[in-house]
């Protein structure tokens, strides 16, 4: 799968990460007869992400330039980036200033302290073709990896209803923060249970400000 909701790691990396829990909040370490398979779902991937070397700024810029060129070949001139860290804002601005990033880019912020500080300082933000006015939240995982949060168990995995990646408390907090800052809240929601939770959170937020454009994606 190429969707950011599952990872398959070898024994060396598994041992380096010192994974001991079979399940974590919003994630799962898949096992067969109590033996880890190396398949990590959603938040369980955080165990190994810290062990991997980070891409350099130049590597990221090169990758973005290559992707941009391919998009232009298909006539696509704008895109959304669903979840960026604070460091990426500076990187995007640098590429725009040097003329290397020409795509219209609607970037969503991950819910971090640095990104919240940015939103409070700047409000809805635009730098030439870069637009920042939303926060990205993940309520659940994907159907294919059995991470989407369902009201009923999966038909081929009866013990599982899926995963709640972000607590209801945190999602409520983000919704009120976004209302205050004039930002959108863009929530990943696949399963019926996850969507029900998101709609309840949005309904409560819209009582305070009904003229707001949150979305589920």
Which residues does each PLM region occupy?
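Short acidic/histidine-rich active-site segments
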Residues: 143-146, 183-193
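C-terminal active-site-proximal or functional interface alpha/beta core segments in diverse enzymes
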Residues: 71, 207-217
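Hydrophobic, small-residue-rich alpha-helical packing segments that form membrane-like cores
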Residues: 113-115, 132
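Short catalytic-loop micro-motif centered on adjacent basic/acidic residues
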Residues: 77-82, 106, 184-189, 214-217
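Catalytic pocket of metal/acid-base enzymes, prominently hydrolases
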Residues: 1-108, 126-179
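Long, K/E/R/D-enriched contiguous segments that form extended
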Residues: 174-180, 192-197
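Distinct, well-ordered alpha-helical segments
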Residues: 90-95, 116-121, 195-207
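Acidic-and-aromatic substrate-binding clefts and catalytic sites of carbohydrate-active enzymes
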Residues: 82-88, 113, 193-195
């Amino acid at each position: 799968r190429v969707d950011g909701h599952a990872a398959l790691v070898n024994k060396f990396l598994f041992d380096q990460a010192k994974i001991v829990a079979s399940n974590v909040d919003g994630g799962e370490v898949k096992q067969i007869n109590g033996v880890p398979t190396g398949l990590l779902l959603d938040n369980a991937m955080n165990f190994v992400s810290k062990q991997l070397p980070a891409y350099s700024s130049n590597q990221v810029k090169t990758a973005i330039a290559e992707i941009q060129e391919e998009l232009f070949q298909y006539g696509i001139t704008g895109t959304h980036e669903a979840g960026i860290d604070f460091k990426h804002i500076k990187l995007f601005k640098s590429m725009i200033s040097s003329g290397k990033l020409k795509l219209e880019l609607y970037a969503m912020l991950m819910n971090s302290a640095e990104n919240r500080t940015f939103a409070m300082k700047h409000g809805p933000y635009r730098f030439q073709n870069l637009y920042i006015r939303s926060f990205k939240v993940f309520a659940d995982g994907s159907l294919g990896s059995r991470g989407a949060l369902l009201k009923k168990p999966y038909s081929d995995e009866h013990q599982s209803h899926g995963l709640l990646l972000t607590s209801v408390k945190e999602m409520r907090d983000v919704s009120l923060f976004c209302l205050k800052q004039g930002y959108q809240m863009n929530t990943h929601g696949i399963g019926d249970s996850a969507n029900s939770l998101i709609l309840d959170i949005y309904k409560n937020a819209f009582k305070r400000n009904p003229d707001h454009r949150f979305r589920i994606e």
